[in-house]
């Protein structure tokens, strides 16, 4: 276990550049899984990723110094995969499978460099875009979000003295540990760390991972952060994300192709992966529409990740669909991951225990819960909902509808077209905090 005095390190911050991104493995595992598929099937596709701050009241460009942000983004572009990292990717087993990454893909990955970016300020916000081939721009999503979130944390703490920083981190540690102790009551619960993109800092995420490892033992199944998985000998976890159906939908040339695009993604995915990686993410264009038109073979997949509906409501919908298709939900897996905290984890676990296999991906409320921890009130330490989504593919606008309309992204006229094709049933407005 690596022990770092985080408060001292923050206070002694006197060097010119303290890199936030130190490795290209400091990303979510599903980015690498998706990248291999994109590299194999869609090398000629362009995709633009764009930053969106859902908390409009937070003026990011007023909180974060633009020169500092550029310096961090520029530094990230200098990083390459190390020999040690490439050997680990080639030789390690993931999800019980050896050589999950092909030698040809790894040979390409060894020379990978993050592409250029475009950054400007407008009305107190940053407009940050990444243009280029999909297999290059996709790798910006996680480091860009981690960089901005950590710069915001650093800016918020800049006025705190050494003693105040000690108090801040002592309270934050106690807050996390109290949550961990609550989870000890459920020895067969399964928890994983999904907190990279909106974390307080890399060092803090590492501490949270160590706390879960120490506190709940085998109930802690691993982390989505590939670098932390390698460094702490944990399982690297993750399946697929909304960007896959968003891009394929944007490339569609007709309403029929658009309607079929989520299922084409699944066909592509199962040509590369199997077993516990066969997890359906149904909500990109609305879960109700997805389930209504899903081919029968989708019911044979290992499980679902109901991401944007309230967890109990979303889980019940999936269980009902499995039963309608003659499948036993007790043999299937539900992965919950949307804005979870210990209260929702406990409630959801108790509700579904014994009815399905369960797993919980704990994100922002694990790795960035500093609200109320400072000796004085600092609003900027409260986590915000920041995303970096596909905004276009081959020049065509991309859309995400979601089960929560507050999470929808895309041009208004395109959102209306997608709603005409997919419908709007059972989409429920909920406030988006993280």
Curated annotation (Swiss-Prot):
Entries under Gene3D superfamilies matching the protein: nicotinate phosphoribosyltransferase
Lineage of the organism: Bacteria, Pseudomonadati, Pseudomonadota, Alphaproteobacteria, Hyphomicrobiales
Protein name in the entry: Nicotinate phosphoribosyltransferase
Modified positions (Phosphohistidine) in chain numbering: 242
Name of the encoding gene: pncB
PTM characteristics: Transiently phosphorylated on a His residue during the reaction cycle. Phosphorylation strongly increases the affinity for substrates and increases the rate of nicotinate D-ribonucleotide production. Dephosphorylation regenerates the low-affinity form of the enzyme, leading to product release.
Disulfide bonds: none
Organism: Chelativorans sp. (strain BNC1)
SUPFAM superfamilies in alphabetical order: Nicotinate/Quinolinate PRTase C-terminal domain-like, Nicotinate/Quinolinate PRTase N-terminal domain-like
UniProt keywords, alphabetically: Ligase, Phosphoprotein, Pyridine nucleotide biosynthesis
UniProt family annotation: Belongs to the NAPRTase family.
Job description of the protein: Catalyzes the synthesis of beta-nicotinate D-ribonucleotide from nicotinate and 5-phospho-D-ribose 1-phosphate at the expense of ATP.
Pathway: Cofactor biosynthesis; NAD(+) biosynthesis; nicotinate D-ribonucleotide from nicotinate: step 1/1
GO cellular component: cytosol
Catalytic activity: nicotinate + 5-phospho-alpha-D-ribose 1-diphosphate + ATP + H2O = nicotinate beta-D-ribonucleotide + ADP + phosphate + diphosphate
EC number, UniProt record: 6.3.4.21
An example Gene Ontology biological process: NAD biosynthetic process via the salvage pathway
Pfam entry (one): NAPRTase_N
Family matches, as InterPro entries: N/Namide_PRibTrfase (IPR041525), NAPRTase_N (IPR040727), Nic_PRibTrfase (IPR006406), Nic_PRibTrfase-Fam (IPR007229), Nicotinate_pribotase-like_C (IPR036068)
Superkingdom in the source lineage: Bacteria
């Amino acid at each position: 276990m690596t022990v770092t005095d985080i408060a001292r390190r923050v206070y002694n911050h006197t060097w010119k550049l303290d890199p936030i991104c130190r490795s290209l493995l400091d990303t979510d595992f599903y980015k690498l899984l998706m990248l291999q598929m994109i590299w194999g099937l869609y090398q000629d596709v362009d995709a633009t990723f764009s930053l969106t701050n859902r908390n409009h009241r937070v003026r990011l460009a007023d909180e974060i110094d633009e020169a500092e942000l550029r310096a961090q983004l520029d530094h990230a572009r200098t990083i390459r995969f190390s020999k040690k990292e490439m050997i680990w990717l080639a030789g390690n087993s993931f999800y019980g499978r050896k050589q999950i990454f092909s030698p040809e893909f790894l040979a390409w990955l060894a020379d990978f460099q993050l592409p250029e970016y475009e950054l400007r300020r407008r009305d107190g916000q940053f407009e940050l875009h990444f243009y280029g081939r999909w297999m290059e721009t996709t790798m910006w999503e996680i480091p860009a979000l981690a960089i901005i979130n950590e710069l915001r944390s650093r800016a918020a703490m800049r006025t705190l003295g050494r003693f105040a920083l000690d108090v801040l981190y002592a309270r934050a540690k106690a807050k996390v540990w109290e949550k961990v102790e609550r989870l000890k009551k459920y020895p067969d619960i399964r928890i994983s760390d999904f907190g990279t993109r909106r974390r307080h800092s890399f060092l803090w995420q590492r501490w949270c991972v160590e706390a879960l490892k120490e506190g709940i033992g085998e109930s802690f199944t691993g982390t989505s952060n590939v670098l932390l998985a390698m460094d702490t000998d944990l399982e690297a976890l993750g399946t697929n994300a909304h960007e896959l159906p968003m891009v394929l939908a944007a490339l569609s040339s007709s309403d029929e192709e658009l309607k079929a695009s989520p299922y084409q993604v699944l066909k592509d995915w199962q040509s590369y992966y199997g077993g516990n990686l066969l997890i359906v993410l149904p909500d990109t264009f609305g879960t109700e529409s997805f389930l209504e038109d899903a081919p029968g073979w989708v019911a044979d997949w290992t499980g679902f990740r109901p991401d944007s509906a309230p967890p109990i409501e979303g889980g019940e919908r999936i269980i009902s669909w499995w039963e309608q298709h003659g499948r036993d939900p007790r043999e299937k897996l539900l992965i919950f991951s949307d804005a979870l905290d210990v209260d929702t984890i406990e409630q959801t676990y108790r509700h579904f225990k014994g009815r399905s296999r369960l797993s919980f991906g704990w994100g922002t409320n694990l790795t960035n819960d500093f609200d109320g921890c400072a000796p004085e009130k600092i609003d900027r330490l409260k986590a915000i909902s920041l995303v970096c989504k596909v905004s276009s593919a081959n020049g065509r606008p991309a859309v995400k509808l979601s089960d929560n309309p507050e999470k929808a992204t895309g041009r208004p006229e395109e959102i209306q077209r997608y709603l005409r094709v997919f419908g709007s049933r059972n989409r429920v407005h909920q406030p988006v905090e993280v």
